[in-house]
């Protein structure tokens, strides 16, 4: 049985041009919770998708400053995780959990 906390760690898959390029190197990119640590991300991916994770790299993308109707606002900061999978394993991120 999957722990419900794993669903709080993984927010969504990140489908971008760069994330499709790193899929050739057996890597998958996820948007994750800002408070999530690398061991929590590794445990969540292994539990939810049933794969073996060899490495987790994280980055924090700062939100851009935008103007809306004359007022300055700021987009949210987003934490991303680049998850490297073991040889021969893959995740189909186009299907839901």
Curated annotation (Swiss-Prot):
GO terms for cellular component: ribonucleoprotein complex; ribosome. This is Large ribosomal subunit protein uL23. The gene is rplW. InterPro entries: Nucleotide-bd_a/b_plait_sf, Ribosomal_uL23-like, Ribosomal_uL23/eL15/eS24_sf. Pfam families: Ribosomal_L23. Part of the 50S ribosomal subunit. Contacts protein L29, and trigger factor when it is bound to the ribosome. Keywords: Ribonucleoprotein, Ribosomal protein, RNA-binding, rRNA-binding. GO terms for biological process: translation. SUPFAM superfamilies: Ribosomal proteins S24e, L23 and L15e (SSF54189). Belongs to the universal ribosomal protein uL23 family. It comes from Allorhizobium ampelinum (strain ATCC BAA-846 / DSM 112012 / S4). GO terms for molecular function: rRNA binding; structural constituent of ribosome. One of the early assembly proteins it binds 23S rRNA. One of the proteins that surrounds the polypeptide exit tunnel on the outside of the ribosome. Forms the main docking site for trigger factor binding to the ribosome.
């Amino acid at each position: 049985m999957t722990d419900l906390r794993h669903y709080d760690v993984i927010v969504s898959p990140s489908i971008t041009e760069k994330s499709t390029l790193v899929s050739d190197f057996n890597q998958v990119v996820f948007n994750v919770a800002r408070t999530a640590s690398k061991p929590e991300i590794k445990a969540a991916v292994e539990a939810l998708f049933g794969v073996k994770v060899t490495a987790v790299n994280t980055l924090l993308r700062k939100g851009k400053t935008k103007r809306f109707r004359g007022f300055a606002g700021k987009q949210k900061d987003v934490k991303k995780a680049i998850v490297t999978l073991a040889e021969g394993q893959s995740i189909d991120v186009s299907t839901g959990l």
